[in-house]
């Protein structure tokens, strides 16, 4: 059926800020869908609160609203825009839940807005556990034995009937939030109590555990004419029990017999047809390895993380097809954009193996609970393509950027046998490395299969990798063996280690023996049809399918997997860089390893190489393509770290040169540069051991800010107040050495600002200055930022502009740079300079309407600001006020402390814009899910040094009608100053929570919690009590503030919304 002509205007709801379980894959899906609908001639209106996305660029939709995805704001936009239809299945769980809410309020009916794509009834059937159970029973599809509980007692009764272990799944939550596997009644009580609070409908599914079954996924598509196909099927390396977002996944499935494959395929198509889904859908199934028994685990009736992976694994653009199906087109009339010959009805066939490995945030959160279960914990993922499992797995391992280049890890090598067994049985993020080590120690794979329930087929592949290692050790420089190792994904570095030579030597011998990679095309049809996609992966075989063109070529390095400190913002900059290169008539080639993002959509660049971002893999592409040069400014620290090795190998780095990058990153060189330019920085020094650090701190004076050099996102950074804490830090957090010094700086608790600047070598443009709401000491990525600044005097603004110009010219910056300042006692100091695009680029580009990454790329390629019509200096400021707010994923990460400090902890960002600061703040808090009730109680438990400042805030809360609750010390101080306060008991390290502030939080007696720890390393009880208070607030979804500056900001909002009542 051709597309519909009775609708003209379609609204799409985005997925909002990035959180664990809902990441960049929705930017990719949403961007594809908006463009697909525009391509078909519809007017597209987009609502999304996340400024860091390509999707929210002005050119992606006809009208873009960066507003909170809440009932209040989406309803306003619906009334204003009056669209004919709404497409909710591309915005993750956020988009779906919003559509459900809108439908329930009756506004869609009132405005006559039709829901496109999958019908609400089908979404309900797939998402509501009870309805889904009924549906599966009606079509004879087997589910796990289960029942719904709405209270803890009900859950216990159900569990007794089914038998332990039990899986708990709260209804309508994303990424398995609040769920888990329970072996005992005690565990069940705890998980269900929390799950019921997190479920918007207060219900949990209590079901039999089938841990140990194989987990298989089918990505399916169906249209309104009941045509249905399988786009891709995938198999998890880990058995059922680990969330598929955290599992290692292979596509296509590897261990299924043809009968099993067809049986599960039939089941998937059976379910999608019964649900009458129109568009993409993901079906998860569990298969008993010892029989033909299977269970349906769940269905996602929307585009998901798995569909982004399936799109990149096959080249079949699922989100684009889903959008076209939503407007009435059918699979047999949509052309497959990869081959431009076949129709979308044609099921993709793969002649390669794809491996996906998740990227976890535990390098940032050392105390986090690393155990993997049904709740997702990964922030991002990498994908690699090879001709066999070994090749794709090892390529994926080195794409992770966790300091390993092979499936071996120092911690695993150093573990004793007892620890090794424990780590194999416990599913953790690093289990692959312990399993590999067990095989190296000669533990039989049958025994490992028994312990881990990982299929013996996969373990046999790991055993083959170990056999190649053993042969390499004894056959040094043997060309045939070198070829075998390369065919199975071994890196030059790993071979060099086994041969005890340098990686350069291995590279030289490879080239002498003509052992160089060829590049194969991803074409969706296993080369059955001619294909024109410029989408390639490397392998060691015969025919090279990537033909070098005659055009001038530029290679752009992407930013790899999404992790805390390096998010989708860098992908945004990469895509804009590509656009600028193309606009100048050159060929843009992208190298990246992240399947979730827009930059790895093959229609974005002229050529896409899906490869690990390591020196070897990047160099191989450069050898083939012979580009004019490589741009490293937009790929975060990942790309910057490759600048030096590439430059040493004779590759031209475009933009700021390597020695100047070094001057910004290396502490001593940077200090010298600042002295030469006469720019002040906080007094500081470098230390290579504990004694030196103590001597430096005594000279500078406490408090000091201490951190290792060369980091992104403030890893292992702390504010320290005395010598005891400093010695503790030096022994616990860092391994200081002359190669890896530690930086000790005076900590100035002043106002923090940051600037992004663009420089052509002579002139400097500052699109804007952002002022941070939280004082210096909170990582810039976790601070709320306001543009234009509200509290800076003209003199200070002038100084900031002057210092920025001096630095950009003095460091020979070509392209982009980011500078952070602190203003202390009316003096401006420079804290740090990043000679690259930073995470504020998308936000600032959107609010100033200056396409910063594109402009910087033009500078890198030799244009200048004047010719492009830009005045040097600070760009004029707009009338609106814009606030960028950080968004955290603490609900997903047990045992991770939410206290803000110099270590970055946020996973995403939201934005609020309006005519006054108060309104913009209100929107940014709403968009970041920090909704404050209009009245209620606020709980204060603050450090002694913060009590004075708390008094003013408490008075303001009382003034607008909030009741005050506080622990003893804080309460006494507030009472002395004439406030009425209800006192609650501290935990005092005890287990009993009755009558304490934790019980108050748990029972919903407080609407907000203000908890500060001060700068002194607190006593153990205070620290653990504070941690328990914060955990409780987070798991109950109660706004928690650990910085008084944020409290002052939210009070501004509340005061602007409340009326004063005064007697006469």
From Swiss-Prot:
Its EC number is 6.3.4.16, 6.3.5.5. Mg(2+) 4 binds at residues 832, 834. It holds the Pfam family MGS. GO terms for biological process: 'de novo' UMP biosynthetic process; glutamine metabolic process; L-arginine biosynthetic process. Keywords: Amino-acid biosynthesis, Arginine biosynthesis, ATP-binding, Ligase, Magnesium, Manganese, Metal-binding, Nucleotide-binding, Pyrimidine biosynthesis, Repeat. Mg(2+) 1 binds at residues 284, 298. Mg(2+) 3 binds at residues 820, 832. Residues 930-1064 are annotated as: Allosteric domain. Induction: Repressed by pyrimidines. Residues 402-546 are annotated as: Oligomerization domain. Its cofactor is Mg(2+); Mn(2+). Mn(2+) 3 binds at residues 820, 832. SMART domains: CPSase_L_D3, GARS_A, MGS. It comes from the Bacteria. Mn(2+) 4 binds at residues 832, 834. Residues 930-1064 form the MGS-like domain. ATP 1 binds at residues 129, 169, 175-176, 208, 210, 215, 241-243, 284, 298. Composed of two chains; the small (or glutamine) chain promotes the hydrolysis of glutamine to ammonia, which is used by the large (or ammonia) chain to synthesize carbamoyl phosphate. Tetramer of heterodimers (alpha,beta)4. PANTHER family: CARBAMOYL-PHOSPHATE SYNTHASE [AMMONIA], MITOCHONDRIAL, CARBAMOYLTRANSFERASE FAMILY MEMBER. HAMAP family: CPSase_L_chain_A (MF_01210_A), CPSase_L_chain_B (MF_01210_B). NCBIfam families: CPSaseII_lrg (TIGR01369), PRK05294.1 (NF003671), PRK12815.1 (NF009455). This is Carbamoyl phosphate synthase large chain. It comes from Lactococcus lactis subsp. cremoris (strain MG1363). The lineage of its organism: Bacteria, Bacillati, Bacillota, Bacilli, Lactobacillales.
